[in-house]
Amino acid sequence: LDASNIKHYAESCPIEEINKAMVSKRGTGKKGFPEYLAMSGDFVIVIEDKAKIEDQAKYLNDNETLLMDTSSVTKYAENGALHYALSIIQNTNFKKVIAFGCSGTDEKRIVIRPIYVSPTGYKVLPKVKDFNQFSANNIDRYYNEVVCGNESIERVELKTILDRAKSLNDDLRNYGQLGDSEKPLVVSAILLALEEKDFSTEN
């Protein structure tokens, strides 16, 4: 978290609304807190950490439905993280939470698994190596691409370039009546012109 410039708080956080929403995993009615809480952009971040990798998660089925009984929520990282995230969703005005189940003590074998939680449900996401994608500068992009499944900015730009290149190629062939050996020269001239600060199609 420190390496990703995400300011975090052990167990409680400065936002009183979130603190009041925390409910014990043991169902005692008392307060309970995850290992860490943080804010990144519009997202609340919840982190539950377990020393043993085998305590990462307990699923109901192959669809990665997390068991939410007291035993599972108490023992397993992902289950516990989801418990606290749901408490925030249900009891505060914050409606976008990313809960992390983490396990392991060896940096080479540590498991970090994000879960996106909203009022409509939750989505267990692919494992990540660190928290860089969840910094204030990157988290919106992660949400758009990984949670929502939208295309990346680079892919959209590449498709736009390829579409325009095809259109230009067709125009040079159909209207410019240029052969294959002549078209690269025209394209090169256009690119050189575009690099000039004073270039304008109106001149």
Regions found by a protein language model. Name each.
Residues 22-34, 119-152:
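Long, acidic, intrinsically disordered low-complexity segments
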Residues 59-61, 114, 124-128, 143-146, ...:
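Generic alpha-helix signal with a bias toward terminal, lower-confidence helices
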Residues 1-98, 102-121:
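A short, conserved, highly charged catalytic patch centered on acidic carboxylates
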Residues 10-11, 38, 86, 118, ...:
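Intrinsically disordered, low-complexity regions enriched in small/polar residues
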Residues 5, 19, 61-63, 79, ...:
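Detector for Asparagine
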Residues 138-203:
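Non-catalytic nucleic-acid substrate-recognition regions in nucleic-acid-modifying enzymes
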